[in-house]
Amino acid sequence: SLSLDLLQKTHDKGLAKYIGVSNYNIAMLNEAINKLTVKPITNQIEFHPLIDQSKILNFAKSKNIDLFAYCSIARGKILEISTLNNIAIRHKISIPQVAQHWAYQKGVIVNSMSTKPDNINDNFNILNFELSIEEMSQISNLNSENHRIVTREKMDDKDPPMGNCVPDWD
């Protein structure tokens, strides 16, 4: 694909030491691994408790490719989930901290952002506790609806259309 050719040229010219991709599914990652002389070191994807990304996570781990989460709190949708609220109360932390630490314990790099000082502070304090195996399982089981924030339909509403930016996921 054109994007892989451009990534390869950028690397060959010494303009990039490493290559990262975004929203790549397993087939796209395989293509990148087979086509590029240097494999991607990271794949940025939507990753939160309401979506099942276990297939891409396992594949990425098997290829030593880090996953980098965006929408880690599902644009606030997780704030409505009682399971996450109960875990947050038990640990005396916020619901976003629960979700971000869940991703961290799964080996995913979390990209979090906020303009509110309290939330920024919370984002820095996701490593001060540990989720139990049972809690990790409870959180992982929240993905039954497979709730996506970024969908082809939502991207097609953009001007210009950006639906091609969102692949059919695994």
Can you say where each PLM-predicted feature lies in the sequence?
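Beta/alpha (TIM)-barrel catalytic core signal, keyed to glycine-rich beta->alpha loops juxtaposed to Asp/Glu
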Residues: 1-170
